[in-house]
């Protein structure tokens, strides 16, 4: 592996780790970092390049699974109650997570080919960034005017399903899965931290499943000499995502979504200018 290849793998892994769980759209940032700047597709065939993006996403998924390991073990019945609300009888269940996953899973299955073929343009992603920013600003405005649930253990099935409906917006590239679901959670009555917790926990099965399916699809395009390149990207994505998720969860109730919305609008405008 050349120095440039190592640099490319590291940068793309860092970008993935920074943006996968922050509500800023990892797709938009990967377009800037890869399609416009580094062009990893020139280092390998398109299928292998897609496989690399799946692998670094798996690094991010592993990071969030580690952050929520106690919660996951509790969901699986392998750990006793770990929070005060759980001791009072409130608890997030696998069924609630499933309810939240169904809408986007169904729409994604039905329209995957259409989305891949027609919606993955720079301009479409830019508009998604701006539209997602508007939703986030609306969520923060609503949050100031209503009481909210301060823990994910108190989420209802209705709220879980509504968050799942908002997640469908993330099928629009650039909208951001975490942006749409955190904003949706806030709109239906969760505080920012509870909405983020539900978003990240819900992300683990849906992202892991989608990533593994894509990896199987592109498996034949891989070769052993790509392993160092993939490993560098995976490690960078994992380490950075681990830090970002912990930092984000500590701050989100304080900073809300406005700073991310402003950043998204600026990035969307930059992307529109780049393709004019």
Curated annotation (Swiss-Prot):
Keywords: Antibiotic resistance, Cell membrane, Cell shape, Cell wall biogenesis/degradation, Hydrolase, Membrane, Peptidoglycan synthesis, Transmembrane, Transmembrane helix
GO BP terms: cell wall organization; peptidoglycan biosynthetic process; regulation of cell shape; response to antibiotic
Catalytically driven reaction(s): di-trans,octa-cis-undecaprenyl diphosphate + H2O = di-trans,octa-cis-undecaprenyl phosphate + phosphate + H(+)
Protein origin, superkingdom: Bacteria
EC number in record: 3.6.1.27
Segments traversing the membrane: 48-68, 92-112, 119-139, 155-175, 196-216, 229-249, 255-275
UniProt GO molecular function: undecaprenyl-diphosphatase activity
An example Gene Ontology CC term for this record: plasma membrane
Primary location: membrane
Membrane topology summary: Multi-pass membrane protein
Enzyme superclass (EC): hydrolase
Subcellular location as annotated: Cell membrane
Misc remark: Bacitracin is thought to be involved in the inhibition of peptidoglycan synthesis by sequestering undecaprenyl diphosphate, thereby reducing the pool of lipid carrier available.
Similarity comment: family membership: Belongs to the UppP family.
Reported function: Catalyzes the dephosphorylation of undecaprenyl diphosphate (UPP). Confers resistance to bacitracin.
Record's protein name: Undecaprenyl-diphosphatase
